């Protein structure tokens, strides 16, 4: 009897599926079309807010599930779960950090949308959505290494984390992209069971990311893809992984090549398995 399994793809956005400067995914279009044709679930995993991800998906219809605020929010089929800390806790820790460091500190939760737009290159409407945060807060600062250490220590003393993404350090809860990936797989397993009437024995997972905050997600995946940082070329691996691939190009161009290669490999290796795409 062939093994019943399902392929699921988890991807970071900024600097990975989306170009770091233009936020375009057009260079990934061939692989995206293939994923859509095969009905493979594609899950966005981002430090962006749920409002941002929902807006992107309303326009592009790329994603089957959304993981927002660095793993603090998991959304599938319009059902949302929050696993991150309260906004009050985030605000308290941020103010403690502000008092302890040696540089000015602002954040997405404390500035006007116009400043978020200037810092990110987003439109004003997109900047408004970027500020609608429930359980995380990207910092706007120019820290020294010592400032980062101080901020991380304060966050950890309160049970929170300070994580480095493609653009910002972000205060967030202990739930990371890897934890959220596991929660999403649990929910997908229920969805497949309800849809097909039989359980999925296992998932084959592919994860793509470019930043330190992607490490927990990459570590959980069967196939992990590290996207090089734009204008910096290839860099040392973010983690040790038995199946880590380094994409040949930054952003969506590298995403496209790496994902197509993995899908080719899975297809050629598992012709005798029953593959559930969606």
Over which residues does each language-model region extend?
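Conserved acidic, metal-coordinating active-site core of Asp-based
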Residues: 100, 104-206, 212
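Residue-level marker for buried hydrophobic side chains located in beta-strands
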Residues: 9-11, 66-67, 207
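Residue-level detector of anion-binding/catalytic polar loops
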Residues: 41, 161, 223-224
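Asp-based phosphoryl-transfer active-site loop
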Residues: 5-22, 218
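Phosphate- and divalent-cation-binding pockets in alpha/beta enzyme and binding domains
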Residues: 52-55, 115, 150, 216-217
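Mg2+-dependent phosphoryl-transfer enzymes with acidic/Ser/Thr/Gly-rich catalytic loops
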Residues: 2-4, 25, 31, 169-278
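Active-site phosphate-binding/coordination module
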Residues: 21-110, 229-230
């Amino acid at each position: 009897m062939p093994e019943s399994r399902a392929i699921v793809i988890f991807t970071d956005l900024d600097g990975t599926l989306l170009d770091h400067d233009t936020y375009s995914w057009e260079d990934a279009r061939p692989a995206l079309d293939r994923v859509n044709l095969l009905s493979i679930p594609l899950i966005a995993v981002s430090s962006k807010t749920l409002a941002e991800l929902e807006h992107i998906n309303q326009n592009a219809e790329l994603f089957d599930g959304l993981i927002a605020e660095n793993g603090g929010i998991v959304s599938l089929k319009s059902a949302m779960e929050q696993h991150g800390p309260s906004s009050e806790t985030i605000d308290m820790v941020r103010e403690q950090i502000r008092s302890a460091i040696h540089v000015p500190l602002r954040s997405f939760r404390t500035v006007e949308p116009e400043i978020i737009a200037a810092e990110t290159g987003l439109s004003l409407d997109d900047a408004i959505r970027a500020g609608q945060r429930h359980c995380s807060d990207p910092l706007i600062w120019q820290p020294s290494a010592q400032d980062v250490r101080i901020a991380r220590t304060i966050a950890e003393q309160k049970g929170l984390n300070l994580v480095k993404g493609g653009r910002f350090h972000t205060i967030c809860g202990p739930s990371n992209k890897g934890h959220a990936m596991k929660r999403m797989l649990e929910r997908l397993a229920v969805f497949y069971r309800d849809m097909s009437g039989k359980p999925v024995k296992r998932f084959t997972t592919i994860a793509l990311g470019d930043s330190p905050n992607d490490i927990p997600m990459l570590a959980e995946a069967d196939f992990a893809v590290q996207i090089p940082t734009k204008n910096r070329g290839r860099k040392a691996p973010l983690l040790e992984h038995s199946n880590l691939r380094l994409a040949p190009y930054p952003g969506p161009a590298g995403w496209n090549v790496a994902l197509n290669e993995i899908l080719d490999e899975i297809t050629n290796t598992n012709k005798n398995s029953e593959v559930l795409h969606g």
